[in-house]
Amino acid sequence: VDKVSFLQEKSAFHMKYPEQSDLSFYRWFTQQHPDEAIGWYHLGQAREAQGDTRQALAAYRQSLFAKQGPYYDEARDAYQKLLREQSRQGWRNRARLLLASLAFLYAQFVFSPGPLQDGAPAASAQPQAVPASAPAPVQPHVEVIAVPATLSPKELQSQVRRYVEARRPALAQPYTVLVVPEVPGSPLFTPLLFYQPKQVLGVLQYNPVSRTVISQRWFGSPASFDAGATLAAARGDLAVEQQTLQHVLTLRNSLYRYYQQKGTLPASLADLAGSYPGNYLPQVPLPPKRLLLKSYPYHPHAFQSGSAWASLRDVLPLPGYPEPLSPLAPLQVRLSQKSHTLQLVSGTHLVRSYPAAIGKNDSTPEGYYTILQKINQPRGHDNIYGTRGLVFQGNGYAIHGTNHPESIGTSVSLGCVRLFNAAVEELYTFVSLGTEFIISNAPVPAQPWSNPALFILPAGPEEETPNVIYTWLH
């Protein structure tokens, strides 16, 4: 339904029911067209105008689970804005309570008997100077692309040559292309940023400045990527580039979610690695040694609220490598109940794919959620929750590990989502508070995917809740 059709339906509704309000129309429209974001957005606007924040958030959330269309982006912005306002209101209430307590204590102190002595004058607070660091040296760039299985050797080499010759002019250094067999469900001739090759059909090094092939080798049949000296350099270069991309994506997503919830960026990256319940990240990742950086550069002054995500490229730049041609996007967790698969995605990029156990009898709730809490070593009888927990709904629903790994891939829980412990530890590393989680019953086929080496940042005792025994719907 486009905007014109929506307005026409609204006009027809009021002509037929002149005594009904706009709110009545929006409620009627969402019942007739539950998959259209435009109706849920306007219903949310009407609820918000009435001051009914809970109903407004529910409507905005439903619009984000609808198909993309008119007002989808507006609904997303309104949803996040209302969440931020709720968070700020909570802080204001707590601040008022704190100020009242301080005022009472001050009055007790001022009017109490006894001599008072002036203390030493307090030093004025000054912002910490961040030492400037040299940019990271340019690193060997590697791209992994999948190609159709039907190409002859001659066609394959010709099409890969056309691929490298058509690359963006921003690439000014020689780079390597790893050609892998077709990955079902993934695009062809498109960089697969977070795919770990098992087999390769060929490797080519290209100079985009002189537009010449520096070296190339083609295998008559798929060759193992993990063996042989020929691919040793490419293996090492790809591993470091993927590690750097993962670090930067994790940090940018955490900064973005922090801004969505608090309306500002943290003073330093270290503020992201707080204690529970403010633990956006378990730790701040350190750059790979070959980048020659002590820490990732952070420039919060470069942030622009009008283009929050896009400006994070300047706030936290990708050191040593070109930005991906298909831009990175905020991380999102998606669960397909039909295929028992949980995926971590960044826009068009599949970052990770894990098999999952879900609720029996459709007890895992379909819908749009956000990560509310992250708990290290969640307590439960017999270690039923494994090593990590990510709560996405306040009444007992979480993504967690398991002490029954044989259950993964089945419908056996009371509603929670189970992962292997190593998988939930990696997801816990990637995913910050506020990250979106979408659960769908749509029949999405399982996509075979080869994850890179595990990316796990150790979680400390400050992220544990030792005095809480959880009763999640495991």
Which residues does each PLM region occupy?
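Gly/Pro-biased beta-strand-loop elements
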Residues: 311-407, 469-474
